[in-house]
From Swiss-Prot:
Gene3D superfamilies hit by this protein: NADP-dependent oxidoreductase domain
GO cellular component: cytosol; mitochondrial matrix; mitochondrion
Catalyzed reaction equations: 17beta-estradiol + NADP(+) = estrone + NADPH + H(+); testosterone + NADP(+) = androst-4-ene-3,17-dione + NADPH + H(+); 17beta-hydroxy-5alpha-androstan-3-one + NADP(+) = 5alpha-androstan-3,17-dione + NADPH + H(+); 3beta-hydroxyandrost-5-en-17-one + NADPH + H(+) = androst-5-en-3beta,17beta-diol + NADP(+)
Taxonomy of the source species: Eukaryota, Metazoa, Chordata, Craniata, Vertebrata
One Pfam match: Aldo_ket_red
UniProt source species: Homo sapiens (Human)
Example of a GO biological process term: estrogen biosynthetic process
Keyword set includes Mitochondrion: yes
Other comments on record: Has no counterpart in murine species.
Protein name, UniProt field: Aldo-keto reductase family 1 member B15
């Protein structure tokens, strides 16, 4: 079983990576070091997570220890929508590169398709509490990102949270130089994203699954929300394979050729989450897990839905 997916650029993206959203300062550095020791080579970062300097420290320490070389690692980061105006893309990118203490990124993503008002606030709101859109669009940001590829600062570009209409707009953009290599979206058995995955794969775009375990630690979780890790059917499948429910959920993506980036700050879980290459789910088990789909999102971003380019109104 391949432990990577091949991008349209022929680069190899490790199929399991470490997610770092909500990885707390003071803890994320250790988490990244544990992950590298456990043979993770793919680390998923973002300007918005405000912890890239610690991720960078961990990477540098591991490189200095000769535990890993930079070229063995696959580092992804993202530009936030308050930076969509062309000069700001570079400003945000330069901070990311400096924080991560790297000379290049393997993939740079657009974090979210809607442009927000520029400024220091990640979620700019008017006096009524409504989000304010910005002048820059994802197409403007893409042009600035293409320059980073031309300069050798980024190997490839991608998107996140895009629906297929938005990807079409990007692919059909006049003068497009570089196609997106991946679309990173929320994906798990309650949101299987079958049509979107099929569409992306048909265009040579890989899919990366964030919140593959259903984001159990999200701050806005309600007691009545479904819990994937506690799902009796998934527990049953896990017991049969002598694996944890998390390992089954991660394996589910791997068998769909979907890259998966579970986040954990617990060393034992970090190690466990990559021990997913020594078992295989049967076709029947895959079908059972796929049948759980209910188009339920842990992240619905409803507060952005009044702005242009909201991605989740489309079927896929």
């Amino acid at each position: 079983m391949a432990t990577f997916v091949e991008l349209s650029t022929k680069a190899k993206m490790p199929i399991v990576g470490l997610g770092t959203w909500r990885s707390l300062l003071g803890k994320v550095k250790e988490a990244v070091k544990v992950a590298i020791d456990a043979e993770y080579r793919h680390i998923d970062c973002a300007y918005f997570y405000e912890n890239q300097h610690e991720v960078g420290e961990a990477i540098q320490e591991k490189i200095q220890e000769k535990a890993v070389m930079r070229e063995d690692l696959f580092i992804v980061s993202k530009v936030w929508p308050t930076f969509f105006e062309r000069p700001l893309v570079r400003k945000a990118f330069e901070k990311t590169l400096k924080d991560l203490k790297l000379s290049y990124l393997d993939v740079y993503l657009i974090h979210w398709p809607q442009g927000f008002k520029t400024g220091d606030d990640f979620f700019p709101k008017d006096d009524k509490g409504n989000m304010i859109s910005g002048k820059g669009t994802f197409l403007d940001a893409w042009e600035a990102m293409e320059e980073l590829v031309d300069e050798g600062l980024v190997k490839a570009l991608g998107v996140s949270n895009f629906n297929h209409f938005q990807i079409e707009r990007l692919l059909n953009k006049p003068g497009l130089k570089y196609k997106p290599v991946t679309n990173q979206v929320e994906c798990h058995p309650y949101l299987t994203q079958e049509k979107l995955i099929q569409y992306c794969h048909s265009k040579g775009i890989t899919v990366t699954a964030y919140s593959p375990l259903g984001s159990p630690d999200r701050p806005w979780a309600k007691p009545e929300d479904p819990s994937l890790l506690e799902d009796p059917k998934i527990k049953e499948i896990a017991a049969k394979h002598k694996k944890t429910t998390a390992q089954v959920l991660i394996r589910f993506h791997i068998q769909r050729n979907v890259t998966v980036i579970p986040k954990s700050m617990t060393p034992a879980h970090i190690v466990e989450n990559i021990q997913v290459f020594d078992f295989k789910l049967s076709d029947e088990e895959m079908a059972t897990i796929l049948s759980f789909n209910r188009n339920w999102r842990a992240f619905d971003f409803k507060e952005f839905s009044h702005l242009e380019d909201f991605p989740f109104d489309a079927e896929y």
